[in-house]
Amino acid sequence: MFVIISLHNCVVISFVLFLFGGNNFIQNFYLPQNYIDQFLLTSFPTFTSVGVLIVLVLCSAFLLLWQGEGVNLR
């Protein structure tokens, strides 16, 4: 069960990294470039790789807690 949760977290983390990557097709296709610039630059002026790591760790912890409800992880 823990292996499945870990694999799912790896997929989610990879998808988040893909979305926050520099030049990718999904970001450029679904969101206009000026909207991306306005939203990201005003919301995340210091959005560095450290910030990405913090967000990924928090998301992974939340997913583990959310999926681990009712599952004895001891």
Curated annotation (Swiss-Prot):
Keywords: Membrane, Transmembrane, Transmembrane helix
UniProt keyword Chloroplast, yes or no: no
Tissues showing expression: Testis. Expressed in several cutaneous T-cell lymphoma (CTCL) cell lines, in head-neck carcinomas and carcinoma of ovarian tissues.
Transmembrane segments: 1-21, 46-66
Compartments, as annotated in UniProt: Membrane
Highest taxon of the lineage: Eukaryota
One cellular-component annotation, GO: membrane
Membrane-topology annotation of the record: Multi-pass membrane protein
Other facts noted in the record for this chain: Cancer-testis antigen containing the epitope FVLFLFGGN which is detected in sera of CTCL patients according to PubMed:12839582. Tumor-associated antigen found in several cutaneous T-cell lymphoma (CTCL), and in particular in mycosis fungoides patients and in Sezary syndrome patients. Detected by 5 of 15 sera of Mycosis fungoides patients and by 2 of 3 sera of Sezary syndrome patients, but not by any control sera. Expressed in around 35% of the tested CTCL tumors.
Protein name: Cutaneous T-cell lymphoma-associated antigen 1
Species, as recorded: Homo sapiens
Lineage: Eukaryota, Metazoa, Chordata, Craniata, Vertebrata
This protein's encoding gene: CTAGE1
